Regions:
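N-terminal short beta-loop-beta anion/metal-coordinating cradle
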Residues: 16-55
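A glycine-rich, hydrophobic loop/mini-helix early in the fold
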Residues: 43-73, 77
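Short beta-strand segments
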Residues: 38-40, 62, 96-100, 162-165
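Gly/Ser/Thr-rich loops at beta-strand to alpha-helix junctions
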Residues: 41-44, 101-105
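The start of beta-strands in P-loop NTPase/AAA+ ATPase cores
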Residues: 57, 94-95
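Divalent-metal-activated hydrolytic enzyme cores
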Residues: 1-32, 65-68, 73-92, 102-181
């Protein structure tokens, strides 16, 4: 049996439940909270659990460390463009970046492991050296600035930065929502 089999059973229960899809956004890709969350792939950092995000409320993008990369910038720019063109009368669109304590990306700080991984996937080792979330408050500030300074990001986008403590379960705001400079 596949590892996803129990989840497919849950999906059938979800799909058949009355009102399961209520509260979905009126327009595709524009979440009801005008929120885009970028966070880590770590299974302990699920926005639905730690923030109570419900279906249709936010776009969620996950990658190693929840770091802002050129691909993430492009995706945020696309979402911001959709909001700009399809719902220009709406409120600003917020990107919430959430890093966390005890992040597995710290393993990429190990020179030998990072070198081996870079060789295996054909990645630039210098780029991987910038990935580890050793100090989540520092890295989330850096990533907020990366979004704010990206030319592709529309003016309607605000960015905030947060740190989730996996030990306490508390999310702390490090950078309040702010717009481009």
């Amino acid at each position: 049996m596949s590892n996803i089999a129990p989840l497919l059973d849950r999906n059938r229960a979800f799909a058949s439940a009355p009102g399961a899809r209520q509260g979905m956004p009126r327009l595709p890709f524009i979440p009801t909270l005008n929120l885009y969350i970028v966070t880590c792939i770590d299974c302990r950092v699920d926005p639905a659990q730690i923030l109570g995000v419900k279906l249709g409320e936010a776009l969620v993008q996950r990658n190693i460390g929840g770091r802002i990369t050129p691909a993430v910038i492009r995706d945020i720019a696309y979402a911001g463009y959709l909001v700009d063109t399809k719902a220009p009368e709406g409120p600003y669109f917020e990107v919430a970046i959430v890093h966390h304590t005890d992040c597995g990306s710290t393993l990429l700080a190990d020179d030998e492991l990072r070198h081996g991984f870079a060789q295996r996937i054909g990645a630039d080792e210098r780029t991987l050296a910038d990935t580890p979330v050793l100090d989540p408050a520092r890295t989330v500030r850096t990533d907020v600035e990366r979004v704010l300074w990206a030319d592709e990001i529309p003016e309607n986008v605000r960015v905030s930065g947060h740190v989730y403590d996996v030990g306490t379960g508390v999310v702390t705001t490090i950078v309040d929502a702010k717009g481009r400079k």
